[in-house]
């Protein structure tokens, strides 16, 4: 459950007398149709209901001790796991609310659960019990905002079909919009951090929670606002924009979720209403100095030649990369270096050339050294810190020659070449002037096609004389199974799917730059597509 931590404290069930104190009440046994509740001292909200025996089950629940800034969406989310929420009345001046569920059974389940597990909103325990009313009737003209939120959440829960609007006023909110956005980053050459997303999306309202993850070989995020209106504004303004100059394109849709469950505050997920959450996987928060420098650099203003208002100058992009991985880029005073330590290699199979080819998918490898006294480990020097971070992010934990490799940043600043005349058995190789570097040309399309290892490979530079069967046979000879193949229309490019990611890695190592004849050397990279 979102925002819930297990504690012993349990709210004492009682009626809504305290909630309604100071309001106009009818006698205990009379119809309460004329009751007026003052919600915040300024505006009045009419509430109609029927009196019930204190503590008896009801589908209308009374919630108290709410934080002052809590939103309707957060309160509604408390009830969603148990059934459909049919009405809500917020009494913000009293930090309390009524929540109506579709059935009494759902309300009983909810109360029973929260009697054992104290719910928290914004790091504050809240208390839930049955109200004295079996139905919640509100004047929608005086409760308009809550009704807008409730309609949006209900539509998402039942239809799960995101709609895009054309205006951003509250009255124009379409029913199937959630306060949670699903964000996909295309052409992600620079790392996009959780803090980058928070800075960008905070311009449209208070961001409550963010979760980042990789799915379908793409970096994605779920981001929750306190209000669906803010989510709509952000989607309309940011969908299709670039975070950095000519890359990192935002693809935004409304999520099917209406509330996010964040368990840890770290570099992958954050609940801004729960600063007490543990880091979980041990990842520390961003260094204050880096965070401050990043905030200063990234003004999110347009720059000449940029494709969108979100484009950020190169220095800011470098700062983002530094913030993401604490690595350095030329001209940026950030810690870290360009050298990676790769361990748990298959020492019988690995060579400097195979490491150059694999790590070269994510940057221009300068030098490779397999350690003389520990041949299952190697040092790899990339062209810059951003490339080393990308390679580490994408290759750590992948299988190469049957072993799961580990990739970390090294303490070394450079990879030393062996002294002249010293035979190191070919364990060290300098690739500084290699013609196979993918990223040496500024603005190369390779910058826009960096994806995690996948079973599907993208093939290019195929000569006209090479047929599908030729390529299938070629890739099958690497020891794997070709599951699918598809030529592009011009037959110069194709997609080829191996049985596993490990087989695809092996095929890429073996066949990238393979001579197909007619002065055509095959280009192989990982694809985000499937066949």
Swiss-Prot record:
Keyword Ligase: no
Subcellular location: Nucleus
Superkingdom assignment: Eukaryota
Keywords: Acetylation, mRNA processing, mRNA splicing, Nucleus, Phosphoprotein, Repeat, RNA-binding
Record-linked InterPro entries: HnRNP-L/PTB, Nucleotide-bd_a/b_plait_sf, PTBP1-like_RRM2, PTBP2_RRM1, PTBP2_RRM3, PTBP2_RRM4, RBD_domain_sf, RRM_dom
GO biological process per UniProt: cerebellum development; mRNA splice site recognition; negative regulation of RNA splicing; regulation of neural precursor cell proliferation; spinal cord development
Modification type Phosphoserine: residues: 26-27, 308
PTM sites of type N-acetylmethionine: 1
Residues covered by the RRM domain: 59-133, 181-257, 338-412, 455-529
A single GO cellular-component term on record: spliceosomal complex
Keyword Ribonucleoprotein: no
Location, primary (coarse class): nucleus
Tissue spec: Mainly expressed in brain, including cerebellum, brainstem, spinal cord, and hypothalamus. Also expressed in the peripheral nervous system and neural crest derivatives, including the dorsal root and trigeminal ganglia, the cochlear spiral and intestinal ganglion cells, and the adrenal medulla. Also detected to a lower extent in testis, heart, liver, lung, skeletal muscle and thymus (at protein level).
Gene3D superfamilies in alphabetical order: 3.30.70.330
GO MF annotation terms: mRNA binding
Role noted for this protein: RNA-binding protein which binds to intronic polypyrimidine tracts and mediates negative regulation of exons splicing. May antagonize in a tissue-specific manner the ability of NOVA1 to activate exon selection. In addition to its function in pre-mRNA splicing, also plays a role in the regulation of translation.
NCBIfam families reported in the protein's UniProt record: hnRNP-L_PTB
Subunit structure, interactors included: Monomer. Identified in a mRNP complex, at least composed of DHX9, DDX3X, ELAVL1, HNRNPU, IGF2BP1, ILF3, PABPC1, PCBP2, PTBP2, STAU1, STAU2, SYNCRIP and YBX1. Part of a ternary complex containing KHSRP and HNRPH1. Interacts with NOVA1; the interaction is direct. Interacts with NOVA2; the interaction is direct.
Name under which the protein is recorded: Polypyrimidine tract-binding protein 2
Organism in which the protein naturally occurs: Mus musculus (Mouse)
Highest classification ranks of the organism: Eukaryota, Metazoa, Chordata, Craniata, Vertebrata
């Amino acid at each position: 459950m979102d925002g819930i931590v297990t504690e012993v404290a349990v709210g004492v069930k009682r009626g809504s007398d305290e909630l309604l104190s100071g309001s106009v009440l009818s006698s205990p046994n009379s119809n309460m149709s004329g009751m007026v509740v003052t919600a915040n001292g300024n505006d009045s909200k009419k509430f109609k209901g029927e009196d019930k025996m204190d503590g008896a089950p009801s589908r209308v629940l009374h919630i108290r001790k709410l934080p002052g800034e809590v939103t309707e969406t957060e309160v509604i989310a408390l009830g969603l796991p148990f059934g459909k929420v049919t009405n809500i009345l917020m009494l913000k001046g009293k930090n309390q609310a009524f929540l109506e569920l579709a059935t009494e059974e759902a309300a009983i389940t909810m109360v029973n659960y929260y009697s054992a597990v104290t719910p928290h909103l914004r790091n504050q325990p809240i208390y839930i019990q049955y109200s004295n009313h079996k139905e919640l009737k509100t004047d929608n003209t005086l409760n308009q905002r809550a009704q807008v939120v409730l309609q949006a959440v209900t539509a998402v829960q039942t239809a799960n079909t995101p709609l895009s609007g054309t205006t951003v006023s509250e009255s124009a909110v379409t029913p199937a919009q959630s306060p949670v956005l699903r964000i996909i980053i295309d052409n992600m050459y620079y790392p996009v951090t959780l803090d980058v997303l928070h800075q960008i999306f905070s311009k449209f309202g208070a961001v409550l929670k963010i979760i980042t993850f990789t799915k379908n070989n793409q970096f994605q995020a779920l981001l929750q606002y306190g209000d669906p209106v803010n989510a709509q504004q952000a989607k309309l303004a940011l969908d299709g924009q670039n975070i950095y100059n000519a890359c990192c394109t935002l693809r935004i849709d409304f999520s099917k979720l209406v509330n996010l469950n964040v368990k840890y505050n770290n570099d992958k997920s954050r609940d801004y209403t729960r600063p007490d959450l543990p880091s979980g996987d041990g990842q520390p928060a961003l260094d204050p100095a880096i965070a401050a420098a990043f905030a200063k650099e990234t003004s999110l203003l347009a720059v000449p030649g940029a494709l969108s208002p979100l484009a950020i100058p190169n220095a800011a992009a470098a700062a983002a990369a530094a913030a993401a991985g604490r690595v350095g880029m030329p001209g940026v005073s950030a810690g870290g270096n360009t050298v990676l330590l790769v361990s748990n290699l298959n020492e019988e199979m690995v060579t400097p050339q195979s490491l150059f080819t694999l790590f070269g998918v994510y940057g221009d490898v300068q030098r490779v050294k397999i350690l003389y006294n520990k041949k299952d480990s190697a040092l790899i020097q990339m062209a810059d810190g951003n490339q080393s971070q990308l390679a580490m992010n994408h290759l750590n934990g992948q299988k190469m020659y049957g072993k799961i490799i580990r990739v970390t940043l090294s303490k070394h600043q450079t990879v030393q070449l062996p002294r002249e005349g010293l035979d190191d058995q070919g364990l060290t190789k300098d690739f500084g002037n290699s013609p196979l570097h993918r990223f040496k040309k500024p603005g190369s399309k390779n910058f826009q096609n960096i994806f995690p290892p996948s079973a599907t490979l993208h093939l290019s530079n195929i000569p006209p004389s090479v047929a599908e069967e030729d390529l299938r046979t070629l890739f099958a000879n690497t020891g794997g199974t070709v599951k699918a193949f598809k030529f592009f229309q011009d037959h110069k490019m194709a997609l080829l799917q191996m049985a596993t990611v490990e087989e695809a890695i092996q095929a890429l190592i073996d066949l990238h730059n393979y001579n197909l004849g007619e002065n055509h050397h095959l280009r192989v990279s990982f694809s985000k597509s499937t066949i």
